[in-house]
Amino acid sequence: MSGHSKWHNIQGRKNAQDSKRGKIFQKLSRELYMAAKQGGPDPSGNPSLRLVMDKAKAANMPKDNIKRALDKASDRDAANYDEVTYEGYGPGGVAILVEALTDNRNRTSSTVRVAITRHGGNMAAAGAVSYMFDRKGYLVISRDDLDVDEDQMLEDALEAGAEDMQTSDEAFEIYTDPKEFAQVRDALEEKGYKFVQNELTMVPQNLTPIPEDKVEKFQAMIDQLEDDDDVQEVYTAGDWPDD
């Protein structure tokens, strides 16, 4: 994992994502609904819900939207969703994982397949790609107005129980074992750190450079996948070229 900057690749796609704010809120509403339905509406006793609520707040999701999603979870007649993961390769042979929440597996499987194959990729069998990724806790702390140098940040992160840290000009990226994520997050919060992002994510063991002549197709594939109402997350092993 050392040397891999998830933040660099996120920033490489940020402008495209900023135009999808309404779609992001819709997906977060579904995640909030499912987390509350499965574990109850109180985030203090439902770690999964707290994670999604942190994610919603980081996305500046309106409080009314959050409340509606949580209220809906108490409706016994409301829809239920299955968690499904699809595996494949995008343009240039770059590994991708697609996580979805769906009430119709056939529909979602079809739309995911179309999005991937239309742009020169292909679907893969279960397990063909997922072994290339590790589940990790992921925390991002912006360096803006942060009066802490890299050595101090690393010391605090390791003391809290983190596994690894990556540094860029913009941020510190902290990776944890998923089982230790809440402990690390809470310990750093107690020290006064604020997170730009904090979540459980899938981190590629190795990055694959996206060929420059494939970048446009790769981005178009991700855009189409993220436009799908059922798709919650798209993870790639792609290393985006610098602008």
From Swiss-Prot:
Cross-referenced Gene3D superfamilies: 1.10.10.200, 3.30.70.980
SUPFAM superfamilies cross-referenced by the UniProt entry: YebC-like
InterPro entries attached to this UniProt entry: Integrase-like_N (IPR017856), TACO1_YebC-like_2nd/3rd_dom (IPR048300), TACO1_YebC_N (IPR049083), Transcrip_reg_TACO1-like (IPR002876), Transcrip_reg_TACO1-like_dom3 (IPR026564), YebC-like (IPR029072)
Main location, first listed in the record: cytoplasm
Classification via Pfam families: TACO1_YebC_N (PF20772), Transcrip_reg (PF01709)
GO cellular component: cytosol
GO biological process: one example: regulation of DNA-templated transcription
Intrachain S-S bonds: none
Disordered as annotated region, ranges: 1-23
Subcellular location: Cytoplasm
Parts of the chain that traverse the membrane: none
GO molecular function per UniProt: DNA binding
Keywords, sorted A to Z: Cytoplasm, DNA-binding, Transcription, Transcription regulation
Protein family per UniProt: Belongs to the TACO1 family.
Protein name: Probable transcriptional regulatory protein LSEI_1022
Source organism: Lacticaseibacillus paracasei (strain ATCC 334 / BCRC 17002 / CCUG 31169 / CIP 107868 / KCTC 3260 / NRRL B-441) (Lactobacillus paracasei)
Source lineage: Bacteria, Bacillati, Bacillota, Bacilli, Lactobacillales
